[in-house]
A protein has these predicted regions:
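Conserved RNase H-like, two-metal-ion catalytic cores of nucleic-acid enzymes
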Residues: 1-84, 88
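Alpha-helix initiation and N-capping motif
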Residues: 31, 68, 79-83, 139-140, ...
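Short, hydrophobic/amphipathic alpha-helical patches that form generic packing surfaces
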Residues: 71-73, 125, 190
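Acidic, Mg2+-coordinating catalytic module of metal-dependent nucleases/exonucleases
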Residues: 94-159, 185-188
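C-terminal accessory/binding modules appended to enzymatic or scaffolding proteins
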Residues: 169-190
Length: 190
């Protein structure tokens, strides 16, 4: 399945929380309590379709969404990664040195945690500015439809492959390696 190793969360007027969903789920966390606490608040994500399936798997259920990547595309930005959008709107250059890190590693080093926290630190301000621009461009209703569609698509039950071990992360890299596939299958079945 899709496993999220870190959830970064910030609520306006509050600090940033970095949550380990794997450890919390193993410890019996009741994600319904989290959903109730968040309520109808809009979740601001960048590239929501990367995160929503993993959220759905553990029981996180956003009710409203603003996706800064979708907004950037609708606004015609030529580059729509979070770093590019942040630089465009806020003039801040986000360091991306840990973007390819193995986020399953524990404990997370302090500089990784700082890196992860900075990603969400900018989202509320980005949403405010991007909503203004969407409205000015007459694209706010279109954006709302796109966000709603992304939310439904991202939280929809995933169609699982009938062969469970083929869900192993990055298994497609072994598609032309029969020996590697056999080893992966063997490890899955142990």
């Amino acid at each position: 399945g899709h496993e999220d190793w870190l959830i970064q969360f910030k609520r306006e007027g509050a600090g940033i929380a970095l949550l380990d969903p794997v450890a919390l789920t193993r410890a019996g966390a009741d994600w319904n309590e989290f959903n109730d606490a968040v309520g109808d608040a809009t979740w601001i994500l960048h590239d929501s379709l990367m995160d929503l399936p993993g959220f759905a798997e553990i029981g996180l259920k956003p009710k409203a969404l603003f996706d800064t990547e979708i907004a950037a595309r609708l606004l015609g930005l030529h580059r729509f990664g979070l770093a590019a959008v942040t630089e465009h709107y806020l003039g801040i250059t986000l360091a991306k040195e840990h973007s390819a890190a193995d986020w399953s590693y524990r404990p997370l080093p302090r500089d990784w945690r700082n890196y992860a926290a900075l990603d969400v630190e900018v989202l509320i301000e980005l949403e405010t500015m991007m909503r203004r621009d969407l409205k000015a461009a007459g694209k706010d209703e279109w954006a709302a439809e796109e966000f709603s569609h992304a939310l439904v698509a991202g939280l929809a039950p995933r169609k699982l492959h009938p062969i469970p071990w083929l869900h192993i992360s990055r298994i497609t890299q072994l598609s032309r390696d029969p020996r590697g596939l056999a080893i992966a299958k063997s490890l899955w079945e142990e």
